[in-house]
A protein has these predicted regions:
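Aromatic/basic-lined ligand-recognition segments
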Residues: 133-155
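Long, positively charged amphipathic alpha-helical accessory segments at protein N-termini or as interdomain linkers
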Residues: 103-129, 156-216
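Short glycine/proline-enriched loop/turn "hinge" motifs that connect secondary-structure elements
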Residues: 69-75, 159
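Short, conserved charged micro-motifs
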Residues: 54-55, 90-95, 176-178, 206
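Internal, conserved structured core segments that host functional sites
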Residues: 79-134, 139-140
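Active-site loop/lid in soluble adenylation, ligation, and acyl-transfer enzymes
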Residues: 1-56, 61-63, 69, 83, ...
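Gly/Ser/Thr-rich beta-alpha loop segments that engage phosphate groups in nucleotides
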Residues: 68-69, 154
Length: 216
């Protein structure tokens, strides 16, 4: 299996804090994969999450793409951003369909590692807690393993292209999300979040290698 993406792609490993790694990337003129390293525990809120109260003791930043909160911990998630310019053959005007191809890449990568995965091709299914917690809902192009969400995808578009932000879970604690966001009733939120998502039974390195190999 090749160690990098196809020649049509540029692989970059930016450095910085989680907040810095969420900064605008500027005009998108080519296909790029950004592999981001998480150095400190950080709760990342979606662009529409305003006035959210978060428990003390953790860094909090806001991303420019939508969806609910994502908890990033070192070693707990494989965070990959994918940049696609407008007009590329991978570009899809229909936002509801625009992430399907990316979900299929993740599913193919997981298949290489012996994990059966399903790409959600239906509409957004936020459930009760999806507006607050990314992994409590299911959106188009996101990936489920044994009925639980394991890869989340959000996107931000501008005139130049799309930035897809992917988080593949290597660890998951619904209890911690309930505590950080103060969700109530606690028992109901705990049960929902613990069953809604689950970590992948793979290591970050092989998963990244397989993901890069399956990029079109």
């Amino acid at each position: 299996m090749p160690e990098g993406p196809p020649d049509d792609w540029t692989l970059e490993r930016p450095t910085g804090t989680v907040e810095e790694l969420h900064a605008p990337v500027g005009p998108i003129s080519r296909r790029v994969v950004l592999v981001n390293e998480v150095k400190a525990p950080t709760l990342v809120l979606g662009s529409a999450q305003r006035g959210v109260e978060v428990a003390t003791g953790i860094d909090v930043v806001r991303r420019r793409s939508g969806g609910g909160a994502v908890l990033l911990r070192p070693g707990g998630v494989l965070w990959v951003d994918v940049l696609v310019p407008r007009g590329d053959v991978l570009w899809e005007e229909d936002i509801a369909r625009s992430t399907w191809w990316l979900g299929e890449v993740w599913a193919a990568a997981l298949a290489d590692l012996g994990v059966d995965a399903v790409v959600h091709r239906g509409p957004m299914e936020p459930g009760r807690w999806g507006a607050m917690v990314c992994f409590a809902g299911i959106g188009p192009g996101e990936v489920l393993v044994e009925g639980r969400k394991s890869v989340g995808v959000s996107q931000r578009r501008d005139r130049s292209g799309a930035r897809f932000q992917c988080a593949a879970l290597l660890e998951w604690s619904g209890h911690e999300m309930v505590r950080l966001l103060g969700l109530v009733p606690v028992e109901e939120a705990d049960g929902c979040l613990e069953s809604a998502a689950g970590p992948l039974p793979v290591r970050s390195g092989p998963l990244l290698e397989a993901f890069l190999a399956h990029l079109p």
